[in-house]
Amino acid sequence: MIKELDTVVLSRDLSEHSLKRGDIGAVVHSYKEGKAFEIEFITGQGDTVTVATLNSEDVRLMQGKEILHVRKLQAA
């Protein structure tokens, strides 16, 4: 179950925010017993890209054996 402060992985592209499936975010708030979340996505330097309200099917928990990947953020 996803909870506040968990690291999550985006399950689909969010082109309106220049985010792609696989991007990493942090849960900053949970709604409706975990059916929706406020997720903050940041750059490698810690600048906020966006805070998006997403449904539980839009994200998944990051797994322990996964590795991060870097890509350049494209303007929306």
Regions from the PLM with identified roles:
Residues 2-65:
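Basic/aromatic-rich interaction segments and small domains that mediate binding to polyanionic partners
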Residues 64-76:
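Long, low-complexity intrinsically disordered regions
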